[in-house]
Amino acid sequence: MYLRPIFLGIFSFLILTVGRGEMISPLKIPLLMSANFGELRPNHFHSGIDLKTQGRIGLPVYAMDDGYVSRVVVSPWGFGRAVYINHSSGLTTVYGHLDRFAPFIDEIVRRQQYEQEDFSIDCEFAEGEIPVAQGDIIGYSGNSGSSGGPHLHLDIRDTDTQDPMDPQEWLSPLITDDVAPEVRNLVFYTHEGVMGNTTRRMERKAVRASAGSY
């Protein structure tokens, strides 16, 4: 189900201004989603998509394009083990809930953990420190962090602003999806300022006029 949510708030009206270069799939299995971009969570919108890993841990995860590792996070919460890659296109791809990193990243992570004397780390790297090529294995899928089961969380962001973009804009031809969305309600959230005479959420019931029309 390919949802195109309208965000009146946290994401505002994000207009894509960067070119869409050719990206490859981060997984070499048929892509099935377990969560869409923009899904409403208890305290945030879902900033990416969740890709199923056939209920398995340890599938190779591939860099979607040339670039460099700009950030690596290890945490018992959030994305767990995560790799951030900056690309020359002005995009950043984020791969979350990894079971482990590729050896060339893991070596650096372990060194940082020993230096900081802490399991949890959040390290940033400059361009050229950890280069990657499209198709390089950067880690292996897992269930680390705040995850309810094995899957790969994938973000695509604007590097400069870190605004999230819908990964389906790049991957939709590869994602098996034949379930049409059903609109039930439209909910408005304010980000800054006032909406009408209120700053609270407003919800309106969607009335179906005909197939695909509300």
Language model feature labels by segment:
Residues 1-7:
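Bacterial N-terminal signal peptides that target proteins for export
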Residues 10-20:
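Hydrophobic h-region of N-terminal signal peptides that target proteins for export
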Residues 18-92, 120, 126-128, 133-134, ...:
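Surface-exposed, glycine-biased beta-strand/turn segments
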Residues 40, 101-102:
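A short secondary-structure junction motif
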Residues 96, 103-134:
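Aromatic/His-enriched, Gly/Pro-containing loop or helix-boundary segments
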Residues 97-101, 170-172:
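A short, sequence-level motif marking secondary-structure junctions
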Residues 149-156:
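Histidine-centered catalytic micro-motifs
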